[in-house]
Amino acid sequence: MNQVADILKLAIKAKQQGIDAVLATVVRTEGSAYRRAGAMMLICEDGRSVGMISGGCLEPHIIKRAFWLTRNGANVQVYQTGDDIQYADDGQAQAGVKRTKSDIYDRSDNGLDDDSNSGLDEADFDELNFGLGCNGRVHVLFERLTTATPLLETIRNVRRTQQPITVATLIRANDYQHQGSVSQNRDNLQIGMRINLDEYRSLGSVSALGKTAFSSILANTVEELAEYKLSDKNAEYVTVENGKVTTEWLVQRLQPQLRLLICGAGNDVMPLVTMAKLQDWHVTVVDSRSQYATRMRFPQADVVMSIPLDDRETLLKLSNNAAVALMSHSLSQDRARLAILLEHPDNYRYLGQLGPRYRTERLINEISMNLSNPTMLEAGIHKLHYPIGYKLGGDGPEALALGIMAEINAVMHNQDAPVSGSHNNVSDI
């Protein structure tokens, strides 16, 4: 499932067909949650839907209620994923005091009256409790397609330009002067409003407006948010206090697709392309043999091309900030590609060589013999994963692809996988 790609495609179709839709976005999680902040789901009024914001537990309710929840505009709902019987806290649990219905289902910033839940019956409240045993809370922003379009267009532009953008989404605004949560107050703080923090403009604006374009409260808030730097996360929940107004934001670093460059166009590359595309990666397949590098053989790949072995410029361009898998089954091809890549270890994020360890060591020795200063390859060799992939068991191209994808995922997401730590744990294929 290409979650983001499928959402973008369906949004375009719905707009062209004049069909309304609701975008549901996870804006905050507490405790255990299946999806992280930023996960999205698009629900069309004709019944079509794509994307997931949970493991399938919340989706039936969300599909059922999406249009009802957004009848008065964007709003945030909070879903409990604890046990069937929920308690307010540990002390009350011991005393046998259960949560009330209002504790189990939190309305938030939707501009609705206090009795707005009157349309929900007992069965609905039982459903909203979601006795899943995960002991978490999932905050979900609901908005109609017209409101969400600027965000979807921004995501599409990020994927096209390969340039990340930092966006802040307002998920709550408490105006203490007016005693309560508001969906729109005198400073035009609208739930679901989004700001491009890189350019100081609201999403959907044609040009950068600068700090002075915002109201006094919002201008100070935007300035504080712009100084907020995401560390190792792509999304963060941020609270900003500004005078009598407290705002809560989801700050996201919208990233381009992860990119995979596969050098080699053999049959064993096909399942690797499929697995990468299932995760919505951008996949390029190259080979110097034009009869192998064809669109007919790799219809799922984003780019398929034949490039000469001595085309250094194209190889470095395609491998920039990407994961690279050398899988040609050809000594001459692997030697040529590896020689170029080992000299530029800072150009890519991952480099793996297919084949047994002794084969790769032979390639490295042959490359080193042609250099006046072989030590220049040390950084590249240190970064090289060989043999490529984790040894997970199984046999055949699919098992190989699974091990390769697992290792690349771990490296690209800076995770220490349980089987990592030594080249001896990878498969000698």
State where each predicted segment sits.
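ADP-ribose/adenylate-binding Rossmann-like module
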Residues: 286, 323, 328-334, 340-366
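Segments forming oxygen-rich coordination pockets for charged ligands
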Residues: 1-288, 296-301, 321-323, 407-411, ...
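Short amphipathic alpha-helical segments
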Residues: 273-275, 297-298, 317, 336-340, ...
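Conserved SAM-binding strand-loop segment of SAM-dependent methyltransferases
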Residues: 302-308
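Alpha-helical elements of the RecA-like P-loop NTPase motor core of helicases
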Residues: 60, 270, 335-336, 361
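Adenosine-phosphate binding glycine-rich loop
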Residues: 353-429
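Conserved Rossmann-like nucleotide-cofactor binding loop
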Residues: 268, 291, 359
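Short amphipathic alpha-helix with an adjacent loop that forms part of the alpha/beta core around
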Residues: 310-319
